[in-house]
Amino acid sequence: MLGEDEGNTVLEKGNNPSVKQGEVGAVFIVPKILIREHERVILKQILQILDQDELVQPPLDKFPYKKLELPKYIDELKTRDATNTSYKMIQLDAYGEKKVGSNGELFGGRHYLFNTFTFTAHMGVLLVLLQDVIKVLYQSNATHDEDEFIVQHDQILVMETSEEQTKFLAKNGVIPEESKGSFKYITARSAFVEFGASVIAGGQRIVDDYWESLAKKQNLSSHQRVFKLSTNLISKISLLRPSFQNNRISNANEISANTNNTCTISTSKFESQYPIVTEQPSAEIREAYIENFAKGEHISAIVPGQSISGTLELSAQFRVPRYHSKNSFQQALQMKAMDIPIGRHEELLAQYESQAPDGSASISLPNHIPSVNPSNKPIKRMLSSILDINVSSSKNKKSEENEMIKPMNKGQHKNNTSLNINGWKFESLPLKSAENSGKQQYYRGLPLYEKNTLLERLKQLTPNEIKELEHLHDAVFVNTGLQNVRKVRTKKWKKYWQYKAGIPIGLKRSQLDEFKNKYLKDVLAQTSVTTNFNEITNTDETITTKRVPNPNFLGNCNIKDFKPPYIYSHVNKVPQNVAGDKTAVKLDTEVKNTNANPVVATDPVAAKPDNLANFSNEVAMNN
């Protein structure tokens, strides 16, 4: 959604959608300035999150892989509403109803990205051509199969124009003048309900979605990318961020390699599983551990499973900032100035000393208290450490989490003694410099401040406000550091579950199709041949080892009963013949197992549907 000021600017310049009325209806053309403003907002949003893959969801010329899963919001009979232009909704969103009217009119300064129109036959309901909706979604002038699009979005009622309506749209510039025949169209409200922020100028996830409550339940973020970007916008991003150009070229090379049927997975350098996963220890180690544990002797043992460890000691990494010197608060208390801005303390100090009795000058408060270097001794916290119990050895331990935090505290910030005011020390606050004047950067969660503006603002703080400011900044430092650590540990967990599923550690989402269609077949096709001399029979024996998939292998499931309800595309959509005909609900991915080994082929105890890469070995003897 465009900001209020941006939306008002569009309207003030007279570039609101131009209205063309006639006997058949009215047409609302989207102004070009609105499209340019939309592109500017999207470009700004992408540049802000370009370094966060979980929000950008690359590649940019594809749809984001995290999208809103829509409910079944119409009935099975597809009953039409009172306007006879869309299906009646049996499920609504209270927040979404505040964003759009019953006739498709948007509220809250929102604008559609496509041209809309009305027909007198439909009582003023806003309509839109289906081809315009597809063009906005795909950001391309290429033609797409409308019938396939309708099948994918079967909750939208599609209508066709009459000959008179086609001429009206052609006359008013919605379609080319030489167009003939019928055109498919839908209501603008249906497009907003189905696609949400994707059809709104400057649309943001959740904010401009109809299903706002559902988006929050699905843990979507309002900062994540919404639109599939055009080639023009991607080139502008590459121009503004030259480092992004290299990533785009590498992605293009990967795509071209895939088109030549070359396996990118086999050439990829995947990570070893040993730093991530610790396998089950031997029986001797387990017995020794149990025996010593029974005697009360607790020895360290290898715990099978993930090796995700690493202590983060809060006291060592995040010290509470101190913006006061040793005597700052004592001086303010004696002057009764705890609620007076520190910029006036010098004046109050002069008055305090002038009112002091004779002979007391020796005990008067100093005018300027020198800056005290921060103590290297960490301040103790209630939670001195997290993630591990033993923190004594964590100080000397170089974990990946601690390495993630080091750049925040090393070589990025210099103390600015010019920020100290009457003994109050603000020298640790980050300031903008000539090196980063053109960038929006942060230091430990705090923005880089303008020196002159910051100095005037600091003079207005009172000692009580400084106490609160120290704790607020401390919370920002800790939260920023923990978020960085969470990113590292999230990657570790993803790698761990990749290993447990039989996937090469580090497999990318873009390689998933190749993994299923080519890599797994290559894994099954692997054989090993060894030749040994048998002294008893005085012959050479050739042993051929082949891989045979067990029921845990992807596409080799041996479960043949009812389908679980969660496999259907819609939650409320269940086939009517489930109870009557069991053959109608067999798994589509069922593969007949021709293995002669009954243990491998028919073991139901080990069956777990749709694991990715589990297999067993079969040995054949050839003399």
Curated annotation (Swiss-Prot):
Keywords, sorted A to Z: Activator, Chromatin regulator, Nucleus, Transcription, Transcription regulation
GO molecular function per UniProt: chromatin DNA binding
GO CC terms: chromatin; cytosol; nucleus; RSC-type complex; SWI/SNF complex
Single biological process term from Gene Ontology: chromatin remodeling
Chief location of this protein within or outside the cell: nucleus
Subcellular location per the Swiss-Prot or TrEMBL entry: Nucleus
One protein family per Pfam: CRC_subunit
Superkingdom of this protein's organism: Eukaryota
TM helices/strands, residue ranges: none
Function: Involved in transcriptional activation. Component of the SWI/SNF complex, an ATP-dependent chromatin remodeling complex, which is required for the positive and negative regulation of gene expression of a large number of genes. It changes chromatin structure by altering DNA-histone contacts within a nucleosome, leading eventually to a change in nucleosome position, thus facilitating or repressing binding of gene-specific transcription factors.
Subunit structure as annotated in this protein's UniProt entry: Interacts with SWI3 and SNF12. Component of the SWI/SNF global transcription activator complex. The 1.14 MDa SWI/SNF complex is composed of 11 different subunits: one copy each of SWI1, SNF2/SWI2, SNF5, SNF12/SWP73, ARP7/SWP61, ARP9/SWP59; two copies each of SWI3, SNF6, SNF11, SWP82; and three copies of TAF14/SWP29.
Family according to the record: Belongs to the RSC7/SWP82 family. SWP82 subfamily.
Leftover remarks: Present with 3180 molecules/cell in log phase SD medium.
Protein name in the entry: SWI/SNF global transcription activator complex subunit SWP82
Protein's organism: Saccharomyces cerevisiae (strain ATCC 204508 / S288c)
